[in-house]
């Protein structure tokens, strides 16, 4: 498994054996769920490519899997995120999938504000829901059923995809289904 973190954009060539998974979900106030998800994926598929927008440095517990630690670049982090979100979830012929993890706000390290918890995540999932109304989108959604607004999110996804959109409550289920979607 190789983990790509911001901000350097490097060319990736995902394959069926090494699909690209993008970890989308709350960062500030969300805990380190991305590391937990990466470990679940690593335990299933050691050759997976993971794009993770967390600004992990060389001291992180998964640093041995990094292509390189968080690095400065001329581009905004959003440019990095959009690049890999498109590649994982939209580009045809690319084995990839976006994982949206909608967990609850951390009680020990809550979101500092002033904007609401998971604001960027809601924007991103809304954007890819709109894309799904017009094109093929590869994405899987999981998390905690107590995530505020989940019913509306799942309704919108079901409308966009034309059938009831599945929601997974464990990281193991999310990883399993993301790898299946990535290889379709």
Sequence positions of predicted segments:
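Conserved catalytic or regulatory cores that recognize and/or transform ribose-phosphate-containing ligands
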Residues: 1-184
């Amino acid at each position: 498994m190789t983990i790509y973190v911001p901000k350097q954009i490097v060319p990736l060539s995902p394959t069926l054996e090494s699909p690209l998974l993008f970890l989308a979900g709350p960062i500030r106030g969300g805990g380190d769920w991305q590391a937990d998800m990466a470990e679940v994926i690593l335990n299933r598929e050691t050759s997976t490519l993971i794009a993770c927008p967390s600004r992990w440095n060389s001291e992180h517990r998964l640093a041995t899997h990094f292509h390189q630690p968080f690095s400065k670049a001329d581009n905004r982090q959003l440019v990095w995120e959009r690049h890999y979100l498109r590649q994982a979830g939209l580009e045809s012929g690319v084995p990839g999938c976006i994982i949206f993890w909608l967990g609850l706000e951390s009680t020990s390290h809550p979101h500092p504000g002033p904007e609401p918890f998971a604001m960027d995540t809601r924007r991103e999932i809304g954007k890819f829901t709109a894309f799904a109304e017009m094109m093929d989108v590869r994405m899987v959604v999981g998390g905690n059923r107590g995530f505020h607004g989940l019913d509306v999110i799942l309704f919108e996804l079901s409308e966009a995809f034309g059938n009831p959109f599945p929601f997974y409550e464990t990281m193991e289920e999310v990883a399993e289904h993301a790898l299946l979607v990535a290889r379709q």
